[in-house]
Amino acid sequence: MEPKTKKQRSLYIPYAGPVLLEFPLLNKGSAFSMEERRNFNLLGLLPEVVETIEEQAERAWIQYQGFKTEIDKHIYLRNIQDTNETLFYRLVNNHLDEMMPVIYTPTVGAACERFSEIYRRSRGVFISYQNRHNMDDILQNVPNHNIKVIVVTDGERILGLGDQGIGGMGIPIGKLSLYTACGGISPAYTLPVVLDVGTNNQQLLNDPLYMGWRNPRITDDEYYEFVDEFIQAVKQRWPDVLLQFEDFAQKNAMPLLNRYRNEICSFNDDIQGTAAVTVGTLIAASRAAGGQLSEKKIVFLGAGSAGCGIAEMIIAQTPREGLSEEAARQKVFMVDRFGLLTDKMPNLLPFQTKLVQKRENLSDWDTDSDVLSLLDVVRNVKPDILIGVSGQTGLFTEEIIREMHKHCPRPIVMPLSNPTSRVEATPQDIIAWTEGNALVATGSPFNPVVWKDKIYPIAQCNNAFIFPGIGLGVIASGASRITDEMLMSASETLAQYSPLVLNGEGLVLPELKDIQKVSRAIAFAVGKMAQQQGVAVKTSAEALQQAIDDNFWQAEYRDYRRTSI
């Protein structure tokens, strides 16, 4: 359902003069009316012509096109965001296909690596270990009192790039930009946070420009006590906030999620968001290929928290299609750098133990090796689906893909590793190796593939199809927790919007131009499930939809009225 056009009420503000022009959430630049210029002491501080936001956006678009590199475009857009947020979101929404890869993956990876070099202006909150005893004061310094969504990182596992220290702040900033651009959550309600617990990246420690705490990362009890102090301070300041954990290292991601998911409304996008969008993609791809997800045999390359999170959500989904959990687990095969996870493998992580295969059941496999490689697994399992979350480039070789296609006429191949430089195989190669028969979805954006004069659109399995809708649904419903069932309802809703399923052709995921519509539908499904699960107050469907409409922010200037401080 499209948002209803609503008349914006006037906004009463106490700021005036240059202070108002320096306030990104309120600045209109050349769009201040003559009356506003008189009332807010802006006469003579702006050029004579009063422009519309579309005229401003057109000028910004022309300027944007003048930049030749993606990182320069990223810096330019961040500068607009830090001076006029409403214009920033109007511009991004006007050119979402072009700009999403620039404000987020893959370009944000380079921005994180060069954070201290390209730093212009502070955005968000930096909480260093040195300031751990000032946590409450730091959060009180945040000027926006009604924060509803926080994205927090400690910068240790940024995309596939590893430890970026406080450079990881680029991820919460980019993620929250998508909460607004795709999910309609007002930027005034969002807060990016980086927990500066040091860095083990020697290059950063040796960099004279590095702006973070120059110290090796704290670990173990010190680390968990610091994170706990942060969580308690957030609960004290904003008890109803949605907290998203982002790009924490594997050793910390799952423990933190498990520790806090029932204490504060929180989720981990790398684990749960990635799982939700992947499951939604797989449901749609399975229907397009013929059949249900529960019928498919699935091989994962990468058995970290993200891969195992996806696998567990697939297993949780299959009972909806009539398959038992035990039977579902027998269809999922996890491969890491040591080979297939089996019950005879030592040193498994806790979240891996439920995803092993019994070695005794593999005695008839065609292999001469004790270590069961990805090729061994593909040859013997004959999977329908191959998912890459390894963070290592080139591991889906021609031999592996051709072996898969030999037994599966319509293989589903998903190299999900980010950024583009880490992808397990390129869509071009996968399409060629399967004679144009593979359904391909990637983690990073790729151009359509042309093979034998036919165009193959490549879907980006982008978490932005999921987390903005979840955030909007949580805010609109007032949900106090995010349950697995809420995530599964988001996946199912996403699958319902697949052009390939609806029309028999096109992308397996919706086009970006439809992302706000999809986010609103996901918000409704998530809010409804939250009510059914008892983590939100029950209302009518009409009331929930109205709450979504009321909370859906759009990049339009409001009329300003002067008030005293």
From Swiss-Prot:
EC number(s) reported in the record:
1.1.1.38
Q: Which cofactor does it need?
A: Mg(2+); Mn(2+)
What would be one Pfam family of this protein? Answer: malic
- Which class of enzymes does this protein belong to? oxidoreductase
Provide this UniProt record's keywords sorted from A to Z. Answer: Metal-binding, NAD, Oxidoreductase
Cofactor, free-text remark? Divalent metal cations. Prefers magnesium or manganese.
Q: Which reaction does it catalyse?
A: (S)-malate + NAD(+) = pyruvate + CO2 + NADH; oxaloacetate + H(+) = pyruvate + CO2
State where NAD(+) binds.
157, 270, 418
The record places the site described as Important for activity at 270
**Binding-site residues for a divalent metal cation, renumbered to this chain:** 246-247, 270
| Active site residues per record | 104 (proton donor), 175 (proton acceptor)
Stored SUPFAM superfamilies: Aminoacid dehydrogenase-like, N-terminal domain, NAD(P)-binding Rossmann-fold domains
The protein's matches in SMART domains, at most eight in alphabetical order, are given as:
malic, Malic_M
Q: Name one GO cellular component term.
A: cytosol
In its UniProt record, a GO molecular function of this protein is: NAD binding
Its BP terms in the Gene Ontology are:
malate metabolic process
Check the record and name the PANTHER family matching this protein. Answer: MALIC ENZYME-RELATED, NAD-DEPENDENT MALIC ENZYME, MITOCHONDRIAL
As for family, the record states: Belongs to the malic enzymes family.
Q: How does it assemble?
A: Homotetramer.
Q: What is this protein called?
A: NAD-dependent malic enzyme
